[in-house]
């Protein structure tokens, strides 16, 4: 990824599309033989580094509400609202300040139940 980050020019068209209003959904190939699950945070950081999203908040939206909207699921999920489906994590730290906070999960709630 470091080599790719060094060559930001190869992502110019994607960044231009994003700045023109094209919705960019975060996604990875995590779990495939070449991409481990622990690559999610570095991939989000890479999106921020490229300027593809507006900071950490933009990266989080890309993984949640924007992904739901692109997949036409935004009436059911993607944001925390009454009546929507939601799995929630409680973490140490603030991902708006540091995306690596997403790796410091203290509690997970799935369909309203604690997954301790």
What are these regions (language model features)?
Residues 1-7:
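Active-site gating loops and adjacent loop-to-helix segments of metal-dependent hydrolytic enzymes
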Residues 7-91:
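His/Asp/Glu-enriched, well-ordered alpha-helical/loop segment
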Residues 97:
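Small/polar (Gly/Ser/Thr/Ala-rich) solvent-exposed segments
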């Amino acid at each position: 990824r470091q080599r790719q980050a060094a060559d930001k020019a190869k992502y110019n068209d994607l960044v231009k599309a994003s700045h023109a209003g094209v919705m960019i959904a975060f996604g990875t190939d995590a779990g495939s033989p070449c991409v481990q699950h622990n690559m999610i945070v570095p991939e989000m950081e890479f999106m921020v580094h490229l300027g593809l999203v507006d900071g950490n908040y933009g990266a989080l939206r890309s993984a949640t509400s924007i992904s739901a909207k692109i997949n036409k699921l935004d009436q059911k999920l993607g944001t925390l609202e009454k009546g929507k489906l939601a799995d929630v994590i409680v973490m140490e730290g603030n991902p708006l300040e540091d995306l690596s906070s997403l790796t410091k999960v203290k509690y997970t709630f799935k369909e309203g139940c604690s997954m301790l």
